[in-house]
Protein backbone atom coordinates (compact mmCIF):
# COMPACT_ATOMS: atom_id res chain seq x y z
CA UNK A 1 0.00 0.00 0.00
CA UNK A 2 1.25 3.48 -0.91
CA UNK A 3 0.43 6.26 1.58
CA UNK A 4 1.32 9.83 2.40
CA UNK A 5 1.55 10.60 6.09
CA UNK A 6 2.35 13.62 8.22
CA UNK A 7 5.15 12.25 10.42
CA UNK A 8 7.73 14.16 12.44
CA UNK A 9 6.67 17.61 11.28
CA UNK A 10 6.45 16.77 7.57
CA UNK A 11 3.32 17.67 5.61
CA UNK A 12 1.19 14.83 4.27
CA UNK A 13 2.32 15.59 0.71
CA UNK A 14 6.09 15.63 1.39
CA UNK A 15 6.81 11.92 1.93
CA UNK A 16 5.82 8.56 0.48
CA UNK A 17 5.40 5.56 2.80
CA UNK A 18 4.92 1.92 1.81
CA UNK A 19 3.23 -0.89 3.72
CA UNK A 20 2.97 -4.59 2.88
CA UNK A 21 0.82 -7.50 4.03
CA UNK A 22 0.14 -11.10 3.07
CA UNK A 23 -3.59 -10.35 2.99
CA UNK A 24 -5.61 -7.23 2.12
CA UNK A 25 -7.04 -7.53 5.64
CA UNK A 26 -3.58 -7.21 7.19
CA UNK A 27 -1.71 -7.11 9.37
CA UNK A 28 0.06 -4.29 7.49
CA UNK A 29 3.78 -3.82 8.10
CA UNK A 30 5.73 -0.65 7.27
CA UNK A 31 8.48 -0.82 4.66
CA UNK A 32 11.88 -0.96 6.32
CA UNK A 33 13.03 2.21 4.50
CA UNK A 34 10.00 4.41 5.25
CA UNK A 35 9.68 7.07 4.15
CA UNK A 36 10.76 5.61 0.81
CA UNK A 37 10.66 9.05 -0.82
CA UNK A 38 10.84 12.65 0.43
CA UNK A 39 10.06 15.11 -2.36
CA UNK A 40 7.14 17.55 -2.44
CA UNK A 41 7.16 17.28 -6.27
CA UNK A 42 6.44 13.55 -6.46
CA UNK A 43 5.62 11.84 -3.16
CA UNK A 44 1.86 12.23 -2.60
CA UNK A 45 -0.11 9.51 -4.48
CA UNK A 46 -2.32 10.82 -7.30
CA UNK A 47 -4.12 7.68 -8.46
CA UNK A 48 -3.76 3.95 -8.96
CA UNK A 49 -0.69 2.22 -10.34
CA UNK A 50 -0.96 1.53 -14.07
CA UNK A 51 1.01 -0.08 -16.87
CA UNK A 52 2.40 2.31 -19.49
CA UNK A 53 4.83 1.47 -22.29
CA UNK A 54 5.55 -1.89 -20.66
CA UNK A 55 6.37 -0.45 -17.23
CA UNK A 56 4.51 -0.20 -13.94
CA UNK A 57 3.92 3.49 -13.20
CA UNK A 58 2.80 5.50 -10.18
CA UNK A 59 1.14 8.90 -10.57
CA UNK A 60 2.08 11.44 -7.90
CA UNK A 61 1.00 14.98 -7.10
CA UNK A 62 3.46 17.81 -7.53
CA UNK A 63 2.58 20.08 -4.59
CA UNK A 64 5.61 22.38 -4.97
CA UNK A 65 3.52 25.40 -6.03
CA UNK A 66 0.29 24.43 -4.28
CA UNK A 67 -1.60 21.29 -3.32
CA UNK A 68 -2.34 19.25 -6.46
CA UNK A 69 -0.53 21.58 -8.87
CA UNK A 70 0.67 18.97 -11.39
CA UNK A 71 1.13 15.23 -11.90
CA UNK A 72 4.46 13.42 -11.95
CA UNK A 73 4.34 10.01 -13.67
CA UNK A 74 6.99 7.74 -12.12
CA UNK A 75 8.20 4.41 -13.50
CA UNK A 76 8.74 1.90 -10.70
CA UNK A 77 12.21 0.38 -11.06
CA UNK A 78 12.14 -1.83 -7.98
CA UNK A 79 9.56 -2.61 -5.32
CA UNK A 80 9.99 -5.27 -2.65
CA UNK A 81 10.29 -5.48 1.13
CA UNK A 82 13.92 -4.32 0.99
CA UNK A 83 13.90 -1.44 -1.48
CA UNK A 84 11.77 0.97 -3.49
CA UNK A 85 13.06 2.94 -6.47
CA UNK A 86 11.29 4.98 -9.14
CA UNK A 87 12.18 7.54 -11.79
CA UNK A 88 10.04 10.30 -13.27
CA UNK A 89 9.15 9.62 -16.92
CA UNK A 90 6.51 12.27 -17.60
CA UNK A 91 4.72 15.31 -16.17
CA UNK A 92 1.25 16.72 -16.67
CA UNK A 93 1.16 20.46 -16.06
CA UNK A 94 -2.02 22.55 -15.74
CA UNK A 95 -1.07 24.96 -18.56
CA UNK A 96 -2.92 23.06 -21.31
CA UNK A 97 -6.04 25.13 -20.55
CA UNK A 98 -6.05 28.69 -19.19
CA UNK A 99 -8.79 27.87 -16.68
CA UNK A 100 -7.00 24.82 -15.21
CA UNK A 101 -5.10 25.67 -12.00
CA UNK A 102 -4.08 22.16 -10.99
CA UNK A 103 -4.06 18.51 -12.02
CA UNK A 104 -4.90 16.43 -8.96
CA UNK A 105 -5.54 12.80 -9.99
CA UNK A 106 -4.65 10.48 -12.88
CA UNK A 107 -6.10 7.00 -13.33
CA UNK A 108 -5.67 4.75 -16.37
CA UNK A 109 -7.45 1.41 -16.79
CA UNK A 110 -8.54 -0.65 -19.80
CA UNK A 111 -7.76 2.12 -22.31
CA UNK A 112 -9.66 4.75 -20.33
CA UNK A 113 -7.84 7.76 -18.84
CA UNK A 114 -9.43 9.85 -16.07
CA UNK A 115 -8.11 13.12 -14.62
CA UNK A 116 -9.35 15.32 -11.83
CA UNK A 117 -8.48 18.99 -12.34
CA UNK A 118 -8.96 22.23 -10.41
CA UNK A 119 -10.49 24.90 -12.63
CA UNK A 120 -11.11 28.61 -12.19
CA UNK A 121 -14.81 29.32 -12.61
CA UNK A 122 -16.79 32.48 -12.14
CA UNK A 123 -19.39 32.36 -9.37
CA UNK A 124 -21.67 34.58 -11.45
CA UNK A 125 -22.14 32.46 -14.60
Model-found features: residue ranges?
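Carbohydrate-active catalytic/glycan-binding domains of CAZyme proteins
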Residues: 1-125
